Amino acid sequence: MSCQQSQQQCQPPPKCTPKCPPKCPTPKCPPKCPPKCPPVSSCCSVSSGGCCGSSSGGSCGSSSGGCCSSGGGGCCLSHHRRRRSHCHRPQSSGCCSQPSGGSSCCGGGSGQHSGGCC
């Protein structure tokens, strides 16, 4: 067997495998955190017409559709649309001046139903 024939029969050495394993693909978007919801006892929903709990003291703001900030246990705000007016009347907010639980707590306790209260 000649030298040239022996070189043709030889195969190239196998490729070396990498020592480090390939990195896992990182997700493009981070996992979304669940929205922070207020506890059920501290805030009320406007659609249900419920009132704030006595422990909360009306801590929910009007921007979030919560309860009145003045007075503990106030009622929810009404569904009325905000009018484009620079003047803010006390009855337009839909808050109750009396504590929750009464049928006449809407409209500043005068018995006028303004909606959204107990």
Swiss-Prot record:
Q: Known Pfam families for this protein?
A: LCE
Protein name per the record: Late cornified envelope protein 1C
Main role? Precursors of the cornified envelope of the stratum corneum.
A GO BP annotation: keratinization
Q: What is the additional note?
A: Belongs to the LCE cluster present on 1q21.
Specify residue ranges for compositional bias: Low complexity.
1-10, 90-103
Family classification:
Belongs to the LCE family.
Tissues expressing the protein: Skin-specific. Expression was readily detected in adult trunk skin, adult arm skin, fetal skin, penal skin, vulva, esophagus and tongue. Not expressed in the cervix, rectum, lung, colon, or placenta.
Q: How does it assemble?
A: Interacts with CYSRT1.
Q: State where composition is biased (Gly residues).
A: 104-118
Which stretches are tagged as biased composition: Pro residues? 11-23
Induction (free text):
By UVB.
InterPro entries per the record? LCE
Write out the ranges of the annotated region (Disordered): 1-23, 87-118
Query: Which keywords are on file for this protein?
Result: Keratinization
